[in-house]
Amino acid sequence: MDIVEEKLPIGPEEVAEAAAVLQKYKAGKAALDKRLVDNELWFRMGHWKNYQNPMMEGKPQPSSGWLFNSIANKHADAMDNYPAPNVLPRAADDEQTARVLSSILPVVLEQADYEQVYSDTWWRKLKQGTGVKGVFWDPEAHGGLGEIAIRPMNLLMLYWEPGVEDIQTSPNFFSLRMENTRQLETRWPQLKGHSASVLDVPRFLHDGGLDTTEKSVVVDWYYKKPDAEGRVLLHYCKFCNGVVLYASENDPALAGRGFYDHGKYPFVFDPLFMEEDSPAGFGYIDVMKECQTAIDRMNHAMDENVLLASKQRYVLSDTAGVNEEELADLSRDIVHVVGRLGDDSFRPLQTAGLQGNSLSYRNSRIEELKAISGNRDMTQGGTAGGVTAASAIAALQEAGSKLSRDMLKSAYRAFARECYLILDLMRQFYDEERVFRIVGAAGQNEFVPFSGAALRPQPAGTVGGVELGSREPVFDIVVSAEKKSTFSRLSQNETAKECYQLGFFAPANADAALAALEMMDFEGIEKVRQRVRQNGTLAMQLAVLQSRLTAQEQPGKAAVTGPADNLSTKAAADAMGLGKENR
């Protein structure tokens, strides 16, 4: 009796259909792919390779670094404001869990080498107009225990349905990468005999070329599919050269659950300047190309002019009788001539030097490029004439950095979405308790245990013998800058010194200081208010102690005149009930 194999949900036919959808997505993204390749050349100052300019043919192709300098400064601003997450609970019952998450999330990010991911993504965001990060679960990490992995993604190798603004609304999402065919066959034996690559992917241009003859395109296919109950599940399939390597629908443990419980594509897009009907945006290179091209052409013409003006050339008649080889050889002191020379047959050829208006025009185009990119001299530490006061320079730098602050806000919003994905992966995969080393409030190392059970639905209790079901903890992510720029630190320190000099922290001035703080706004103001309130409360308690001690004094002894001057620390602590705690 023949055994009929059960047909798997995902097989060669489904993969062929997915490949056809991928080709359609590639056609809709062709213009964006061409722009990405072109922008990479611009960033490497090799953009003349894409232009067949008759003026440049056979001549040096100068590429000044004004565009590169603008992008490098934007990247430096981003690294000066490296983000840090703060988890806030939406219910009082989850406050302790939120406090623990605020401590361990930076550790998870550090273990995932997030600072390098953050840097690489910012380079791509500035060059290509969009930074993309992938938040995945790596089941092979830590010897099979598994861990969260965050990777910078190459926008050139990502595909979605044309016309959507949010990738989560795309029915399919494809992530491609090139891998060595032999290594793939070793890991997945079913690939043997299918080494011919059936997909072509766009690639960046390299000076030495890129040999892809021994590589195959591996496709990570994510798609959303409703189940019998109407829930939309996220499924995942990895295939190469038409062969299924893994499919979550073929996995009995995930077929009815989905690959990730959060049901979202594990990619976060962060566009620099948004475009309609696309999750990808455009970057600074796209808006600075024309100006940089004009500067390069003027530099080329000016370089040619300087070389011609500095080199002596001559106009010779055929009847001049001058030995041209001896004339061109600058080491010869004597040049032989046949016959007589005259101005009509031999004269120097003069080349006009650069005009002042030409230099002024080129400088104006350079200033235009700086203005377009928001990369004024003041943002790099330079100042205008007559500005010497430190406060004035700081004010100019702060006013000139508003474009950087705007970019950082969009990056922080993307970072918050990444943190939400991390929490969802913790909820799904942190089955075993893990121990994280954190820095405590006093600066000492603490070891905090944590598992996904703290994030999963908790019993809501009973009322009148009726169970209220379960409640899943929900949190909010607030992002702040962990690494601040030198100016931000100096500004914060100056604010603290001014508050101290004005007597904000004097206990007797607590009420007036709180009134002033109500009209102020700066980072960390809540901590300052809390400290001022504590100082005011301490002053009131000391005043009450003073009155009590004065009333109990024996006649003839001097009265205590000050709340903090004549009252000993021990007596104050004992009277306030702190003595027992300190023993």
Give the role of each language-model region.
Residues 1-256, 319, 353, 357, ...:
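Extended, helix-rich architectural segments
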Residues 91-98, 195-199, 256-258, 273-277, ...:
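A broad, low-specificity signal for short, low-complexity segments enriched in glycine/proline
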Residues 1-59, 125, 133, 139-143, ...:
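C-terminal anchoring/interaction modules
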Residues 280, 284-288:
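Acidic/polar low-complexity segments with low predicted structural confidence
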Residues 127, 152, 213-215, 230-232, ...:
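A short, structural micro-pattern
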Residues 248, 253, 258-267, 280:
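Hydrophobic/aromatic interaction determinants used to assemble and anchor large protein complexes
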